[in-house]
Structures are given as structure tokens and as C-alpha cells.
Swiss-Prot record:
Protein name: Uridylate kinase
Keywords attached to this entry: Allosteric enzyme, ATP-binding, Cytoplasm, Kinase, Nucleotide-binding, Pyrimidine biosynthesis, Transferase
Primary gene name: pyrH
GO biological process, one term: UDP biosynthetic process
Family (UniProt): Belongs to the UMP kinase family.
High-level lineage: Bacteria, Bacillati, Cyanobacteriota, Cyanophyceae, Synechococcales
Residue runs in coiled coils: none
One family name in Pfam for this protein: AA_kinase
Organism: Synechococcus sp. (strain CC9605)
Function: Catalyzes the reversible phosphorylation of UMP to UDP.
InterPro entries: AceGlu_kinase-like_sf, Asp/Glu/Uridylate_kinase, Uridylate_kinase, Uridylate_kinase_bac
Length: 237
């Protein structure tokens, strides 16, 4: 199965590579190169990006900040990442628009659902920044929400591991990978894939989720083509 319209969720941490903080230009270039190939083949692609490479609301809250304030700072971090991705994509020849859930008209369009869909129909990539504009919601939940709004076929969660495991493979050599999971498997377990709100949104709207390794060149294209990479969450295909 080839997907026509895709919502790609990128964590902020993915953009920092091995640096430990900030944005690694080589990672942005690699992502842009993979995205350019799938868009050239006619796939409509929207991106939701996190901000954890710059600031994480939960960590700010744990350090004493008011949770809502910390989340707003995190939203602004996602906008920095979104603009950086736009630059990388356009340098790779991919027309790209940034839409933010918090208005900042000097650097981005406001989020307008119908306009986002129109951009996709014109083969432009749309990068959604500032989360969903409200505190207490993760960017994973934003990805599920935007996927439902734009009628995406699938949510791709591109991470540093090649799928969903029963425990952290970085810490446990005997970790077992799950190639297929139901929404309920994830909601009932403690697999740490996405928060329960994001999974429930995808379940309610019957949007499958594919979790795969972002750092394997060509994986975005393989996922778009429906190749069996990573882990798939959803009802049986």
C-alpha cells in the first residue's frame, strides 16, 4: 500500500543528532533530501516537529516553572525548528510553508486547515509549529490532531529506534520488537510510543501509525511505499 497524504512527526531531539542540544545542519539536510524524493513522487507531506532539542515544557515544569508557561516556551522552540526545516527543505528544492498555532505573521502563516490542505494539493510541504496552541498537549497529540484535520492516510513517527519494543532496546539487549500492534495494545501497555491522547485520537479516526528509524537513509520513502519497516500501530490492514 502506498500512502498519498502523510503526517510526519519529528521529535526535536531528532534534529540535534549527536550534539546533545540545538540543531545539527547535517540532520536537517538528510531529512530534507529524503522528503524531496517522496514529494517528487507525488506524496503529499505535512510535518509536525517537536522542540525538545531546545526546550521541554515538562522539564521546565519539573524545575519549578508553571506548567502552562513552560509549555508555551516549548511551543516557541518548535517554531524555531519549523523555520529551520523550511529553510532546509527549500534549499533541497521543496516548496514549503510553515503554519503556526500561535500567530507570528512575520515568520509564518497562521494555522488554517483549508489553506494547509490547499498547500498539500499544490505539492507543497506544510510544517506545523507551536504545537496545537494550548498547554498540556504534546506534539504527538498535535500530530494526531493535524493528521485527522488534513485527512492524512497515516502518521509516521520517525525516531532514533527502528520500531516499538517491549522495553528500551538501548538499555536491554533482550528487548523484543513488535512489528504490529493494535491501538488497544499501546493504550493498555506502557510502551512509551506516544501519549494516550495521541493514540486515542488516531484510534477514533482510524489513522494508522508507523514508527521507524529516521536515521536510516531512505526510510521515509520506504514507509510511504508501505514496505514493512519499523512497527505499525492500528487495526489489521
Amino acid at each position: 500500500m502506498t500512502y498519498t497524504r502523510v503526517l510526519l512527526k519529528l521529535s526535536g531531539e531528532a534534529l540535534m543528532g549527536s550534539q546533545g542540544y540545538g540543531i545539527d545542519p547535517a540532520i536537517v539536510q538528510s531529512i530534507a533530501s529524503d522528503v524531496a524524493k517522496v514529494v517528487a513522487n507525488g506524496t503529499q507531506l505535512a510535518i509536525v516537529v517537536g522542540g525538545g532539542n531546545i526546550f521541554r515544557g515538562l522539564k521546565g515544569s519539573a524545575a519549578g516553572m508553571e506548567r502552562a508557561t513552560a509549555d508555551y516556551v516549548g511551543m516557541l522552540a518548535t517554531v524555531m525548528n519549523a523555520i529551520t526545516l523550511q529553510d532546509g527543505l527549500e534549499r533541497a528544492g521543496v516548496p514549503t510553508r510553515v503554519q503556526t498555532a500561535i500567530a507570528m505573521q512575520e515568520v509564518a502563516e497562521p494555522y488554517i486547515r483549508r489553506k494547509a490542505i490547499r498547500h498539500l494539493e499544490k505539492n507543497r510541504v506544510v510544517v506545523f509549529g507551536a504545537g496545537c496552541g494550548n498547554p498540556f498537549f504534546t506534539t504527538d497529540t498535535t500530530a494526531a490532531l493535524r493528521a485527522a484535520e488534513i485527512n492524512a492516510d497515516v502518521v509516521f513517527k520517525a525516531t532514533k529506534v527502528d520500531g516499538v519494543y517491549d522495553k528500551d532496546p538501548a538499555k536491554h539487549a533482550d528487548a523484543v520488537k513488535h512489528p504490529q500492534l493494535s491501538y488497544q495494545d499501546v493504550l493498555s501497555g506502557e510502551l512509551g510510543v506516544m501519549d494516550s491522547t495521541a493514540i486515542a485520537l488516531c484510534k477514533d479516526n482510524n489513522i494508522p501509525i508507523v514508527v521507524f528509524n529516521l536515521f536510516e537513509p531512505g526510510n521515509i520513502g520506504r514507509a510511504v511505499a508501505g514496505e514493512p519497516i519499523g512497527s505499525r500501530i492500528g487495526d489489521p490492514a
